[in-house]
């Protein structure tokens, strides 16, 4: 049963049993609680002493109507009650809930205006699966970083009121309670809200954690909050468009309130990867056949090439394929507005560090939790332990040749769509030659390429003989040794890859998690161990082959859940939301 709460409601009772109009009003504002099911809504009004002052059940046939901008009247027999809400916004939320409960169509919310109904239904249905929540919770980097950020900044939570947007299982709400929060309002629009309620009760936190079913754009809170927490990030940070819901929640935030995460940085850098480029072209060559069972398919090859190159590639890669220092685009969640994310334009100018073909742009993101005690970073950079967000690469149909010392400029433009994703337009030009290339991509339909094996370095990465070095070490040859003696640096500082730094937010503030001694800033050499296989505790066998991990397909990715595997290529709904060409895929 869904429950919503409204504070500051005034009650006026009106009757004419004796032929005279009689009025009685409660002097103090009341707390209104509305409990909804499919056929009825139960309305309970309580005073500050939590004594029930008025209770009724509103059915489809109950006589009721709105009065003015923020009042509602209900007639029960010979008497009527007038409910006056604290604000028009509160009344609008209450009125919409009541209309939906009575089988009427409510007013469209901001979320409904920006989202196709079919996309929203599939999205929230997917997040109602415990298996999907498990996949995200088992991302140790994600979950551990959130807990560390909250507990290390416990002064921001101690005796404070917290809002958890899109709480899912409620794990972040529990972290806030661990940090001493006085009250946590956990908002969840999927059926996972029921499971979160079970966990709250079983952990004896029902007095401090209140689960509120519904979309944050449509619910009401009984009070303003001191801090908002959420995990709204998708692929390339923006996919799923949940960041807009996160920003919308600021209507509940006190003027001096905080947000965890506080800022988000998107990084992009040019890369070279001939193998990936040829893979996409090779797949399209199926349609080049002049006689497939006697049918000429070649007329569709051009369309097939366009379709395959419209797919962003979700996987991880060796940092040495990057050809220039990354460009950073920052979103300050405390300052940004929802409409700022409708159209995101990222201009770039790369100073090429290596010569070769530029096959596209690689994207990843970092978010910072800027607390009163310390700043903690969650990074999805290719130098860091792998997360379920991986990295994303966008190919150019026509690669660009650039020399070391050249500059490549252009724009990455992200346009929000009603499928809870973005259409991506990339235009790039080598300034010295005038060579230009572009591509249009659909972030809703990525290609999941991650196989669980260690990413291969680009060709030409050895500056001494690996065979000779193998025997010079006495015949003992490990992966880390082999890379260490290849002539490449034994450590890469992330600052050499990620451009820009802030005065209050720096990479040096990132807190290492876990027991892996190579977890922080040890670069591609020592990260070999942590990046083999997949994320810890995800069920994927470390170092397993593609065939060992699940159904055979190039689109295998973290983690394969047989429950979500449908016909055709191997499909998992375990990563941030995206929809391959023949299925649905959500997650964050």
Swiss-Prot record:
Reaction equations catalysed: L-arginyl-[protein] + 2 S-adenosyl-L-methionine = N(omega),N(omega)-dimethyl-L-arginyl-[protein] + 2 S-adenosyl-L-homocysteine + 2 H(+)
Keywords: Chromatin regulator, Chromosome, Cytoplasm, Methyltransferase, Nucleus, S-adenosyl-L-methionine, Transcription, Transcription regulation, Transferase
Subcellular localization: Nucleus; Cytoplasm; Chromosome
Highest taxon above the source species: Eukaryota
All copies of domain SAM-dependent MTase PRMT-type, residue ranges: 120-427
Enzyme Commission (EC) number: 2.1.1.319
Gene3D superfamilies in the record: Hnrnp arginine n-methyltransferase1, Pleckstrin-homology domain (PH domain)/Phosphotyrosine-binding domain (PTB), Vaccinia Virus protein VP39
GO biological process: chromatin remodeling; methylation; positive regulation of fat cell differentiation; regulation of DNA-templated transcription; regulation of intracellular estrogen receptor signaling pathway; regulation of skeletal muscle fiber development; replication fork reversal
GO cellular component, one term: cytosol
Record bears the keyword Methyltransferase: yes
Top-level EC class as recorded in UniProt: transferase
Principal subcellular localization: nucleus
UniProt subunit comment: Homodimer.
Known function: Methylates (mono- and asymmetric dimethylation) the guanidino nitrogens of arginyl residues in several proteins involved in DNA packaging, transcription regulation, pre-mRNA splicing, and mRNA stability. Recruited to promoters upon gene activation together with histone acetyltransferases from EP300/P300 and p160 families, methylates histone H3 at 'Arg-17' (H3R17me) and activates transcription via chromatin remodeling.
Protein's UniProt name: Histone-arginine methyltransferase CARM1
Source taxonomy: Eukaryota, Metazoa, Chordata, Craniata, Vertebrata
């Amino acid at each position: 049963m869904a429950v919503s709460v409204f504070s500051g409601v005034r009650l006026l009772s009106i009757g004419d049993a004796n032929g005279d109009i009689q009025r009685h009003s409660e002097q103090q504002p009341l707390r209104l609680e509305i409990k909804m099911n499919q056929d009825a809504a139960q309305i309970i009004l309580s005073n500050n002493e939590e004594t029930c002052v008025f209770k009724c059940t509103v059915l489809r046939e109950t006589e009721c109507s709105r009065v003015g901008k923020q009042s509602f009247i209900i007639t029960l027999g010979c008497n009527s009650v007038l409910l006056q809400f604290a604000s028009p916004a509160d009344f609008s939320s209450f009125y919409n809930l009541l209309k939906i409960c009575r089988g009427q169509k409510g007013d469209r919310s901001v979320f409904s205006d920006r989202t196709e109904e079919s996309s929203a239904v599939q999205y929230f249905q997917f997040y109602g699966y415990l298996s999907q929540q498990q996949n995200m919770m088992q991302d140790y980097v994600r979950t551990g970083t959130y807990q560390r950020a909250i507990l290390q900044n416990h002064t921001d939570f101690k005796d404070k009121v917290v809002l958890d947007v899109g709480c899912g299982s409620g794990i972040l709400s529990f972290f806030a309670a661990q940090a001493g929060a006085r009250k946590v309002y956990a908002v969840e629009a999927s059926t996972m809200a029921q499971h979160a309620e079970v966990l709250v009760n079983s952990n004896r936190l029902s007095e401090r954690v209140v689960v509120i079913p519904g979309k944050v754009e449509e619910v009401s809170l009984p009070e303003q909050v001191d801090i908002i927490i959420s995990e709204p990030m998708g692929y390339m940070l923006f996919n799923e468009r949940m960041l807009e819901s996160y920003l919308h929640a600021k209507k509940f935030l006190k003027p001096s309130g905080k947000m965890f995460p506080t800022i988000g940085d998107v990084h992009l850098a040019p890369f070279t990867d001939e193998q990936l480029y040829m893979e996409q072209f090779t797949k399209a060559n199926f349609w080049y056949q002049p006689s497939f069972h006697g049918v000429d398919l070649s007329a569709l090859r051009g369309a097939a090439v366009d379709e395959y190159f419209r797919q962003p590639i979700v996987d991880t890669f060796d940092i040495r394929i990057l050809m220039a220092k990354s460009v950073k685009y920052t979103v300050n969640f405390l300052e940004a507005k929802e409409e700022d994310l409708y159209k995101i334009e990222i201009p770039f100018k790369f100073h090429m560090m290596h010569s070769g073909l530029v096959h596209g742009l690689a994207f990843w993101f970092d978010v910072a939790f800027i607390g009163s005690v310390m700043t903690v970073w969650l990074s999805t950079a290719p130098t860091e332990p792998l997360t379920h967000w991986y990295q994303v690469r966008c190919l150019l149909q026509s690669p660009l040749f650039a020399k070391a010392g050249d500059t490549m400029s252009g724009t990455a433009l992200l346009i929000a769509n009603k499928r809870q994703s973005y259409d991506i337009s990339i235009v790039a030009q080598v300034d010295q030659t005038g060579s230009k290339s572009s591509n249009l991509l659909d972030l809703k339909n990525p290609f999941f390429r991650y196989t669980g094996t260690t990413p291969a370095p680009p060709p030409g990465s050895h500056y001494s003989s690996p065979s000779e070095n193998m025997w010079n070490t006495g015949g003992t040859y490990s992966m880390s040794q082999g890379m260490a003696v290849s002539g490449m640096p034994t450590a890469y500082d992330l600052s050499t890859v990620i451009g820009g730094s802030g005065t209050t937010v720096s990479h040096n503030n990132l807190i290492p998690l876990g027991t892996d001694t190579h977890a922080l800033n040890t670069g591609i050499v020592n990260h070999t161990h942590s990046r083999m296989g997949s994320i810890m505790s995800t069920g994927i066998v470390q170092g397993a082959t593609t065939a060992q991990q699940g159904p055979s397909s190039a689109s295998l990715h973290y983690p394969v859940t047989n429950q979500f595997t449908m016909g055709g290529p191997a499909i998992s709904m375990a990563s941030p939301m995206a929809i391959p060409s023949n299925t649905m895929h959500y997650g964050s």
